[in-house]
Amino acid sequence: HLSLRRQRQMCIRDSDNVCHVVGKDILRFHAIYWPIMLMALDIPIRFKLYVHGWILTKDGKMSKSKGNAVYPMDLIDRFGIDAVRYYLAKELPLGNDGLFSYERFIERYNFELANDLGNLVSRSISMINKYCDGVVPNKDIVKSGEYEQSLCEVANKAITKTIACFDKFRIQDGIGETWQLIKRANKYIDETAPWVLAKDDNKREELASVMYHLAESLRIIAILIAPYLVAVSYTHLRAHET
């Protein structure tokens, strides 16, 4: 149990990092009543409010009586918590209501998580295992050509813009910026065709350079997706360390 004095000290010290995540229907309690109480206690008002909308279905608000309620645990049991977290982050933008439908959920799961991200991770890791014995090549052998420069530009842009979006709680936009890098990395595989380079002994260094750029892309992506794809990010960052 924290004393009132201790709570006050923590509130003042950490208030710049405090964010209230609330639904729009209880905004007044956090935007009006809570600041009044802080002012009465002479505590600075420096917290942030992240106010999200409602999660709707095509029939409107979810209701048990209507029989259109979606139970999160059922989704988590079937698809995993990361997939549910990703969908909500993508479909519930700041300041607006979000729409949930099983069709839309499956579409995002298949096309974005499985096809875009999943294929990139699977292809990259399998090629690093096959062509480099599972060891990421040393940075010293890296060569930078037209494709590598383009990939690096997209990566740097994704880092800057994703962080900027997240700092402003524009989670949906931040995810979109990260996905630009994911799509570019997938394109990089097609452009460089590592399976062709692997057939030519004179292209070993070029192949190693491609593998390095793919591994580095995965590392950056793993960091950027960490807020909403926690398990995926942790798994691949640990794999990268190993």
Feature names for model-found ranges:
Residues 1-8, 12, 236-239:
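Single conserved hydrophobic/aromatic residue that forms the stacking wall/gate
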Residues 91, 96, 104-141, 151-238:
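Helix-rich, typically C-terminal accessory recognition domains appended to large enzymatic cores
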Residues 6-9, 13-102:
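Alpha-helical recognition segments enriched in aromatics with Gly/Pro capping
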